[in-house]
């Protein structure tokens, strides 16, 4: 198990560096003479027609609705594996990260609403600081190498996965509008087909892919956010075949490099470019960026620690063997790295609220995530044994 986690984390570390490069490049282009070219590229209309089917969207939405559906497919595969065989497969294993994740979503949302509750336009962004960027958080931890106990890595991984599951529920319940019943019926038929394939023990990924594409198109047209199709597909792909092989894990391992080195960097490049020319100091101190930044930087660690501590004291959970609160605390700070997941929710929350709110949200996300990453890294580095010492 340790070897698998180390391989996973080494890949996430490289992906995290690429994410930083993508963000820096996006910010550079958005605030340079090439800004018009950058925005024009993202707004380029792309059309797909097949008979009566017509999908016409700017490139930015193809990235957010299409590429991110593949990312959520990967998240769904990870959630399913951990629920059935991994760190969430029993109540004793799942209890601490579950309580931590719940606190890590509720407190940041409460902090954001404290600053934005009176504004009906901005309060819809309450879920933005509730997210954790699993790839980036694990990537920062991976920079510390073998000094990090495996149990601490598993705790962060399990917490982030439950957090992602919470984000999936939030998107389904709060960011789906103008529902089309015909599209929902087609989506239901596709889901029925996927479930039937699973029940019949079909392990070939091709039929899941065909029905998955139909499901994605139907969900895209239905008003429910299209990325949720990826999660449904993931839950329907069998974890184990009769011969002991795992179609689900095979697909998960195949998707990881695509997610780390293409999907997430492209998403970051498309969404992180904030033009700062019209953003003054007063704007940075406005309720949206302040609520998001404080939600990530303070709300996340407070929520994670408060709910974890309460669960342990009430004997509803226990700390992993060999792990103390002095190690949990900096990991809780790392959970404030919202980054791509927070930007994704921001793109949904302020889709119709105006470009300014979207820009302010991204500034808050970048500030909160950056400080959480730096503080979490140096704090964890300080409390862990030095290289060569026994953990």
Swiss-Prot record:
It catalyses: Na(+)(in) + 2 H(+)(out) = Na(+)(out) + 2 H(+)(in). GO terms for biological process: regulation of pH. It is a multi-pass membrane protein. It holds the Pfam family Na_H_antiport_1. The keyword Nucleotide-binding does not apply. Its main location: membrane. GO terms for cellular component: plasma membrane. GO terms for molecular function: sodium:proton antiporter activity. Keywords: Antiport, Cell inner membrane, Cell membrane, Ion transport, Membrane, Sodium, Sodium transport, Transmembrane, Transmembrane helix, Transport. Na(+)/H(+) antiporter that extrudes sodium in exchange for external protons. NCBIfam families: NhaA, PRK09560.1, PRK09561.1. Belongs to the NhaA Na(+)/H(+) (TC 2.A.33) antiporter family. This is Na(+)/H(+) antiporter NhaA. The gene is nhaA.
